[in-house]
Amino acid sequence: MSQPWSPDSWRALPIQQQPRYPDAAHLAQVEQTLASYPPLVFAGEARELRRQFAEVTQGRAFLLQGGDCAESFAEFSAAKIRDTFKVLLQMAIVMTFAAGCPVVKVGRMAGQFAKPRSANDETIDGVTLPAYRGDIVNGIGFDEKSRVPDPERLLQSYHQSTATLNLLRAFAQGGFADLHQVHKWNLDFIANSALAEKYSHLADRIDETLAFMRACGMDSSPQLRETSFFTAHEALLLNYEEAFVRRDSLTNDYYDCSAHMLWIGDRTRQLDGAHVEFLRGVNNPIGVKVGPSMNPEDLIRLIDVLNPDNDPGRLNLIARMGANKVGDHLPQLIRAVEREGKKVLWSSDPMHGNTIKASSGYKTRDFAQILGEVKQFFQVHEAEGTYAGGIHIEMTGQNVTECIGGARPITEDGLSDRYHTHCDPRMNADQSLELAFLIAETLKQVRR
């Protein structure tokens, strides 16, 4: 990695998880068009997120990251964006109050279209076709035409991301994020929840605090009516990402302006690979998914490449172990990081290591396993004397039935009722809020 970096230096290295486009000239034309379009985000915003990440790394804030497994063209609507944003706000206010610290809010939104796959092809009833890699690449329909990778989908992804970002900015700054309104939504959730008795005391304390602030004349403060919200996605399709690399006029640094934060998946984190090469050169805050196959030596080498200056706001290690593997694998990684004095933000992805197949054939996740991994993540960090800095979840504001369990339990038999995901199962609004209240209890104990 001592070679000079450029936005296209990744093209000379081995690359994983890429579609096979049949028309290279068409792809090159689309890449050129994308590069001529305005950026989706600005360097100053990415710098601000990096500053906030540093606060998390140093134990002064907490990271909440959530959103769709994969955004889709078919389910694109203002209502769906609003509902997911709303639930993230609800989760954040509970965590903020319990932890007594700021919660950095990052959505898997406005760009989370591409998905890595375990195989290049898919076979059903003896018919083999290219795997569905997300709407940015090909269609989900199991027919030859749908599954051909189409460069025009890159353009559609850009336009949908633009509209999504526009709406998110309006929601964040236009009064929708008012703390009083968000708290009212939480009161409605608790009133209709089986957990009412357990969490009503926390809601009452938030109510009292807001009433006190109102009595002091602080209810019109911008801090109560507006919020900061950032976007992120997996940097998987590097031809798309390269098109949004811009040089900041203030610092002369390169930024990938397709999102505020980008991350590398567990399948594409090879030290000699294209994805690591690309992300080492952009100045955004970045993440790496860390699974049970990661060993301490490789992790340290990866950190050295991606965060050579040991900046506390640069690198988020996203642990995705599985509930039954956290205790066996996470401690040795934390110890290696501490031993080498590396400054990283640790967060937990309790989703990807806990995917199972129900007897009905649906892919699902058990809420008890999700919660179990989160609890163990906190316990391991407490035992090691380190800071559990965040949570990274796949969720939606919609009332879907994709993950089993929760206070309003979804059973395996009920999965088919509203199973809408284009890829992996997501927690619904109730399950997400239940998780937030449970994490809030843990944060309160940790930060005493």
Residue ranges: model-predicted function:
Residues 1-136:
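Long, contiguous, compositionally biased segments that the model treats as domain-scale units
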Residues 1-37, 405-448:
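N-terminal charge/polar-biased segments
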Residues 48-50, 272-275, 302, 330-333:
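Glycine-rich, charged/polar anion/phosphate-binding loops
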Residues 62-70, 280-282, 311-313, 352-357, ...:
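Short acidic (Asp/Glu) and glycine-rich catalytic loops that position anionic groups and cofactors
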Residues 69-71, 109-111, 293, 322-324, ...:
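Short, glycine-/Ser/Thr-/acidic-enriched flexible segments
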Residues 76-322, 365, 390-392, 409-448:
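Active-site-facing alpha/beta catalytic cores
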Residues 299-309, 313-346, 352-404:
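Non-transmembrane, aqueous-exposed alpha-helical and coiled segments at domain scale
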